A protein has these predicted regions:
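Helix-loop-helix hairpin linking two adjacent transmembrane segments in secondary transporters
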Residues: 90, 119-120, 124-173
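Conserved MFS/SLC helix-loop-helix module at the cytosolic interface between two early adjacent transmembrane helices
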Residues: 50-89
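Cytoplasmic helix-loop-helix junction between adjacent transmembrane helices
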Residues: 94-133
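Juxtamembrane intracellular "pre-TM" segments in multi-pass secondary transporters
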Residues: 178-202
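Short hydrophobic/alpha-helical segments at membrane-entry points of transmembrane helices
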Residues: 89-95, 201-202
Length: 247
């Protein structure tokens, strides 16, 4: 289950961090403005947010595997749509689909682990998952640079599709259905959490910290590479160092 969970969770940071070194090239190819590139980043996050709640509801009713495999398939297709984009609108569509697929697998990572592990082992597993989330931002800019040194920016999105395909295939072969035969009380009322002060407080604190990170990630490619003249290699090194420090 840990291997399956690792392969589920990596799509979320891969979809954010792998393509950052190519942002100026994408903007030039698609003749997109700085605002449009930032919008594409926001659309990815909106796709994630839209499917986190929906994915949980579907998983509770129809099973975890359907959401995992469906999310991986959506991510593959969306990555290829983005890779073949000829205009910013098609790129937006691909990014939204990537976010939707990543969001489905993101929520299923924690759902599956909660289904099969005790509280003590769950805490340990979540620490390991957090380690994976921290490592990806260190490696992704470098991997993106290596891909960009051989291909154009479209190759990065093909690589994303391959990662999602591997994730989907491994989960298809190894992941067993973990949905409990009897749902816990309140499982069918996900919106009830919005009335919990503790949940809302934790959500706001987490959102504030994540927002700061995502704002930096969103604006840094254009500021450093276009504004300050950093090369893709220099930008990849800066991102790797910053991610390493944050760990």
């Amino acid at each position: 289950f840990l291997l399956c969970s690792f392969l589920m969770i990596i799509l979320y940071p891969v979809g954010i961090d792998l393509y950052l070194v190519a942002v100026p090239q994408i903007a030039q190819t698609l003749q997109a403005s700085e605002a449009q590139i930032h919008t594409a980043f926001s659309i990815y996050l909106f796709g994630m947010a839209a499917t986190v709640l929906l994915g949980g509801i579907i998983a509770d009713r129809h099973g975890r595997r359907w959401v995992v495999l469906g999310g991986a398939l959506i991510f593959v297709i969306a990555s290829l749509v983005a890779a073949n984009a000829t205009g910013i609108s098609q790129f937006y569509l691909g990014r939204f689909g990537q976010g939707a697929g990543a969001g489905a697998l993101y929520i299923m990572t924690f759902t599956v682990l909660r289904d099969v592990l005790s509280q003590a082992r769950l805490a340990m597993a979540l620490s390991m998952i957090n380690g994976v989330i921290c490592v990806i931002p260190v490696l992704a800019p470098v991997l993106g640079y290596l891909i960009l040194s051989r291909f154009d920016w479209r190759g990065i999105f093909v690589a994303m599709a391959l990662v999602a395909a591997v994730s989907g295939l491994v989960n298809l072969l190894l992941l067993k259905e973990t949905r409990p035969a009897r749902q816990q009380s309140g499982a069918t009322r996900p919106l009830a959490l919005l009335g919990s002060p503790r949940f809302m407080l934790h959500s706001l604190l987490t959102s504030a910290s994540v927002t700061a990170i995502l704002v930096y990630v969103s604006v840094s490619p254009l500021i450093l590479m276009q504004g300050l003249g950093f090369t893709t290699e220099q930008y990849a090194i800066v991102m790797m160092v910053m991610a390493g420090v944050s760990m």
